[in-house]
Protein backbone atom coordinates (compact mmCIF):
# COMPACT_ATOMS: atom_id res chain seq x y z
CA UNK A 1 0.00 0.00 0.00
CA UNK A 2 1.11 3.57 -0.68
CA UNK A 3 2.79 5.36 2.24
CA UNK A 4 2.17 8.87 3.58
CA UNK A 5 5.65 10.00 2.49
CA UNK A 6 4.99 8.79 -1.09
CA UNK A 7 1.75 10.79 -1.17
CA UNK A 8 3.57 13.88 0.19
CA UNK A 9 6.09 13.58 -2.68
CA UNK A 10 3.27 13.29 -5.25
CA UNK A 11 1.56 16.40 -3.81
CA UNK A 12 4.81 18.39 -3.90
CA UNK A 13 5.39 17.39 -7.54
CA UNK A 14 1.83 18.36 -8.48
CA UNK A 15 2.22 21.76 -6.79
CA UNK A 16 5.49 22.47 -8.64
CA UNK A 17 3.81 22.21 -12.03
CA UNK A 18 0.90 24.45 -11.05
CA UNK A 19 0.40 28.01 -12.26
CA UNK A 20 -0.54 30.67 -9.71
CA UNK A 21 -4.34 30.92 -9.54
CA UNK A 22 -6.68 33.42 -7.91
CA UNK A 23 -8.69 30.71 -6.14
CA UNK A 24 -7.83 27.90 -3.73
CA UNK A 25 -7.31 24.90 -5.93
CA UNK A 26 -8.53 21.63 -4.47
CA UNK A 27 -6.41 18.47 -4.31
CA UNK A 28 -8.19 15.24 -5.22
CA UNK A 29 -7.45 11.59 -4.68
CA UNK A 30 -8.05 9.23 -7.61
CA UNK A 31 -8.34 5.51 -6.90
CA UNK A 32 -8.91 2.82 -9.51
CA UNK A 33 -10.35 -0.48 -8.36
CA UNK A 34 -9.88 -3.89 -9.98
CA UNK A 35 -11.36 -7.40 -9.86
CA UNK A 36 -14.76 -6.11 -8.73
CA UNK A 37 -17.92 -6.65 -10.76
CA UNK A 38 -19.99 -3.48 -10.32
CA UNK A 39 -22.63 -4.98 -12.64
CA UNK A 40 -23.32 -7.61 -9.98
CA UNK A 41 -24.45 -4.96 -7.55
CA UNK A 42 -21.24 -3.98 -5.74
CA UNK A 43 -21.64 -0.44 -4.42
CA UNK A 44 -20.18 1.75 -1.70
CA UNK A 45 -21.56 4.87 -0.06
CA UNK A 46 -19.14 5.69 2.74
CA UNK A 47 -18.95 8.75 4.96
CA UNK A 48 -15.35 9.11 6.08
CA UNK A 49 -14.23 11.56 8.75
CA UNK A 50 -10.92 13.16 7.84
CA UNK A 51 -8.17 13.78 10.41
CA UNK A 52 -7.55 17.28 9.02
CA UNK A 53 -10.35 19.70 8.18
CA UNK A 54 -10.26 21.34 4.77
CA UNK A 55 -10.35 25.13 4.51
CA UNK A 56 -13.98 24.83 3.39
CA UNK A 57 -15.89 22.42 5.67
CA UNK A 58 -18.60 20.14 4.25
CA UNK A 59 -22.03 21.79 3.97
CA UNK A 60 -24.51 20.18 6.37
CA UNK A 61 -28.28 20.69 6.50
CA UNK A 62 -30.23 19.61 9.59
CA UNK A 63 -33.90 18.68 9.25
CA UNK A 64 -35.37 19.30 12.68
CA UNK A 65 -37.81 21.35 14.73
CA UNK A 66 -38.04 22.44 18.36
CA UNK A 67 -35.05 22.01 20.65
CA UNK A 68 -32.94 20.09 18.12
CA UNK A 69 -33.56 22.74 15.47
CA UNK A 70 -32.49 25.52 17.87
CA UNK A 71 -29.38 23.61 18.94
CA UNK A 72 -28.48 22.96 15.28
CA UNK A 73 -28.72 26.71 14.55
CA UNK A 74 -26.52 27.50 17.55
CA UNK A 75 -24.01 24.87 16.39
CA UNK A 76 -23.75 26.65 13.00
CA UNK A 77 -25.57 24.16 10.77
CA UNK A 78 -25.52 25.53 7.21
CA UNK A 79 -29.32 25.33 7.19
CA UNK A 80 -32.06 24.07 9.48
CA UNK A 81 -35.14 22.83 7.62
CA UNK A 82 -38.43 22.33 9.47
CA UNK A 83 -41.72 20.54 8.58
CA UNK A 84 -43.08 23.54 6.67
CA UNK A 85 -39.91 23.85 4.62
CA UNK A 86 -40.03 20.15 3.72
CA UNK A 87 -43.70 20.43 2.72
CA UNK A 88 -42.87 23.39 0.43
CA UNK A 89 -39.99 21.51 -1.19
CA UNK A 90 -42.28 18.52 -1.84
CA UNK A 91 -44.40 20.81 -4.08
CA UNK A 92 -41.45 22.06 -6.16
CA UNK A 93 -39.15 19.48 -7.81
CA UNK A 94 -36.81 22.13 -9.24
CA UNK A 95 -36.33 23.83 -5.86
CA UNK A 96 -35.86 20.37 -4.28
CA UNK A 97 -33.02 19.49 -6.68
CA UNK A 98 -31.33 22.84 -6.09
CA UNK A 99 -31.65 22.37 -2.33
CA UNK A 100 -30.20 18.83 -2.40
CA UNK A 101 -27.24 19.82 -4.58
CA UNK A 102 -26.38 22.64 -2.16
CA UNK A 103 -25.43 20.29 0.70
CA UNK A 104 -22.91 17.48 1.16
CA UNK A 105 -24.74 15.87 4.08
CA UNK A 106 -28.19 15.81 5.65
CA UNK A 107 -29.02 15.04 9.27
CA UNK A 108 -32.63 14.53 10.37
CA UNK A 109 -34.51 14.24 13.63
CA UNK A 110 -35.78 10.63 13.69
CA UNK A 111 -39.39 11.80 14.01
CA UNK A 112 -39.05 13.76 10.75
CA UNK A 113 -37.64 10.82 8.74
CA UNK A 114 -41.06 9.68 7.37
CA UNK A 115 -41.74 13.23 6.10
CA UNK A 116 -38.23 13.49 4.63
CA UNK A 117 -38.74 10.17 2.83
CA UNK A 118 -42.10 11.29 1.45
CA UNK A 119 -41.01 14.76 0.34
CA UNK A 120 -37.39 14.25 -0.80
CA UNK A 121 -36.69 10.50 -0.73
CA UNK A 122 -36.95 10.05 -4.52
CA UNK A 123 -34.22 12.65 -5.04
CA UNK A 124 -31.99 11.95 -2.03
CA UNK A 125 -31.91 8.16 -2.47
CA UNK A 126 -30.34 7.93 -5.95
CA UNK A 127 -27.71 10.52 -4.96
CA UNK A 128 -26.73 8.51 -1.88
CA UNK A 129 -27.66 11.47 0.32
CA UNK A 130 -30.42 10.07 2.54
CA UNK A 131 -30.18 11.82 5.92
CA UNK A 132 -28.45 10.29 8.90
CA UNK A 133 -31.13 9.91 11.62
CA UNK A 134 -30.40 11.82 14.83
CA UNK A 135 -32.23 10.39 17.88
CA UNK A 136 -34.08 12.64 20.30
CA UNK A 137 -31.69 14.10 22.91
CA UNK A 138 -28.59 13.07 20.88
CA UNK A 139 -25.88 15.78 20.85
CA UNK A 140 -26.55 17.41 17.46
CA UNK A 141 -23.39 19.51 17.97
CA UNK A 142 -21.12 16.43 17.83
CA UNK A 143 -23.00 15.09 14.77
CA UNK A 144 -22.42 18.44 13.01
CA UNK A 145 -18.77 18.57 14.03
CA UNK A 146 -18.18 15.05 12.64
CA UNK A 147 -19.98 15.59 9.33
CA UNK A 148 -18.37 18.99 8.67
CA UNK A 149 -14.97 17.24 8.67
CA UNK A 150 -16.14 14.28 6.55
CA UNK A 151 -16.39 13.40 2.88
CA UNK A 152 -18.60 10.96 1.00
CA UNK A 153 -17.01 8.24 -1.13
CA UNK A 154 -19.29 6.48 -3.60
CA UNK A 155 -18.73 3.54 -5.91
CA UNK A 156 -21.59 2.73 -8.27
CA UNK A 157 -21.37 1.45 -11.86
CA UNK A 158 -17.70 2.46 -12.07
CA UNK A 159 -14.30 1.22 -10.90
CA UNK A 160 -12.90 4.68 -10.25
CA UNK A 161 -13.20 6.88 -7.17
CA UNK A 162 -12.51 10.61 -7.03
CA UNK A 163 -12.69 12.60 -3.82
CA UNK A 164 -11.36 15.85 -2.45
CA UNK A 165 -8.64 15.48 0.21
CA UNK A 166 -7.61 19.12 0.69
CA UNK A 167 -6.47 22.22 -1.13
CA UNK A 168 -3.16 23.82 -2.11
CA UNK A 169 -3.06 26.03 1.01
CA UNK A 170 -2.92 23.00 3.34
CA UNK A 171 0.26 21.38 4.61
CA UNK A 172 1.22 18.40 2.42
CA UNK A 173 1.36 16.07 5.44
CA UNK A 174 -2.21 17.00 6.41
CA UNK A 175 -3.46 16.29 2.88
CA UNK A 176 -1.54 12.99 2.81
CA UNK A 177 -3.03 11.98 6.18
CA UNK A 178 -6.51 12.65 4.76
CA UNK A 179 -5.73 10.49 1.71
CA UNK A 180 -4.42 7.65 3.90
CA UNK A 181 -7.57 7.80 6.08
CA UNK A 182 -9.72 7.35 2.95
CA UNK A 183 -7.59 4.50 1.56
CA UNK A 184 -7.54 2.67 4.93
CA UNK A 185 -11.32 2.96 5.23
CA UNK A 186 -11.88 1.70 1.67
CA UNK A 187 -9.60 -1.30 2.16
CA UNK A 188 -11.88 -2.53 4.97
CA UNK A 189 -14.95 -2.29 2.70
CA UNK A 190 -13.58 -3.94 -0.46
CA UNK A 191 -14.19 -7.69 -0.97
CA UNK A 192 -10.44 -8.47 -1.16
CA UNK A 193 -9.14 -5.39 0.60
CA UNK A 194 -5.87 -4.00 -0.71
CA UNK A 195 -5.88 -6.47 -3.63
CA UNK A 196 -8.87 -4.63 -5.16
CA UNK A 197 -6.89 -1.37 -5.52
CA UNK A 198 -4.95 -1.01 -8.76
CA UNK A 199 -1.33 -0.05 -8.08
Model-derived features with residue positions:
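Interdomain regulatory linker/hinge segments that flank or connect interaction modules
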Residues: 6-17
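Glycine-rich phosphate-binding loops that contact phosphosugars or nucleotide phosphates
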Residues: 74-77
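Flexible, glycine/charged-enriched surface loops at secondary-structure junctions
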Residues: 21-26, 189-198
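Translation machinery proteins
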Residues: 17-70, 92-93
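Short, hydrophobic beta-strand segments that form beta-sheet elements in well-ordered domains
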Residues: 60-64, 79, 106
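Long, compositionally biased eukaryotic signaling regions
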Residues: 4-6, 196
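OB-fold/S1-family RNA-binding modules
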Residues: 1
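Long, charge-patterned amphipathic alpha-helical coiled-coil/hairpin "stalk" segments used as oligomerization
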Residues: 81-190
Amino acid sequence: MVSESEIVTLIQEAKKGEKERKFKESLELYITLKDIDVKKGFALNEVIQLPNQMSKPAAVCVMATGDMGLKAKDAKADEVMDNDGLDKLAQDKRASRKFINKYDFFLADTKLMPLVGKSLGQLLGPRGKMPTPVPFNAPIESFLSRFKTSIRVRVKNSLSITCKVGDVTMDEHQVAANAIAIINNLVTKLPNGNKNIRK
